[in-house]
Amino acid sequence: MLTLIPLPAFEDNYIWVWHDAKYAVAVDPGDPAVLSTYLDSRGLALAAVLVTHHHRDHTGGNTWLRQRYNCAIYAPDNPRIPAVSHVVRGGDSVAVPELGLALAVLATPGHTLDHVSYVGNGHLFCGDTLFGCGCGKLFEGDAAMMSASLDALAALPPTTRVCCAHEYTLSNIDFAKTIDGANPALLERERIDRAARAQNRPTLPSTLALERTTNPFLRFHDADMRAFAVGELGSPDPGPATVFGAIRAAKDRWDG
């Protein structure tokens, strides 16, 4: 029986830890102190680290953790990611035999060019590509690239549990309501997620089914999101990537 825990780190990061009674795998452990405190208090050995992209809040623990636990570190091919033992690319798989896990690697560029996601045992570890009711900013990629990555994630089974790297859900819901405020599924999600945060509980993991019905960044094929893009751009027939780009631009303006 595996336990999945989102460990809060920094202001709003989550370090995802999947473990049994002896071994653990961690995703994007930017703060090694947070992770090691959890592991050591339970007598867990760190078998592997999975890194989604090169940003420091996702990679800052790599060097210390590899020295401390002699763990494998899987990451995309980028010299800015330290202490990597195994480079991964889309189409690869990662085995963690200590936990009986096999995870597929998906290339999900957009937030960064090197971004990958990991999928296995009904769980998606998507870093900063997909958030609760949102998606990552386009720091390196473009709208076509990110929309293709999100389409790939949306094609996973609806029961897939979505394990994002940041607790941004309530802010993302606030934005989503400005363009999709009549969506009853979104309003029900807001009720549930606000109650969770009021009790200091995470809003994650969500499910792909929930994201498909409430997240505007997975709904850019839908008629109401296309209508929003037409109003924003004045284009009579925008394609899916253009619709996504209009939603992303609106979110960037809303963020200020």
Swiss-Prot record:
Where in the sequence is the signal peptide annotated?
A: none
Q: Which cofactor does it need?
A: Zn(2+)
Mind telling me which SUPFAM superfamilies this protein's record contains?
Metallo-hydrolase/oxidoreductase (SSF56281)
Cofactor binding remark: Binds 2 Zn(2+) ions per subunit.
Quaternary structure, from the entry = Monomer.
Family recorded in the similarity comment: Belongs to the metallo-beta-lactamase superfamily. Glyoxalase II family.
Primary role: Thiolesterase that catalyzes the hydrolysis of S-D-lactoyl-glutathione to form glutathione and D-lactic acid.
Q: Which HAMAP family match?
A: Glyoxalase_2 (MF_01374)
Protein name, entry field = Hydroxyacylglutathione hydrolase
Q: Which organism is it from?
A: Thiobacillus denitrificans (strain ATCC 25259 / T1)
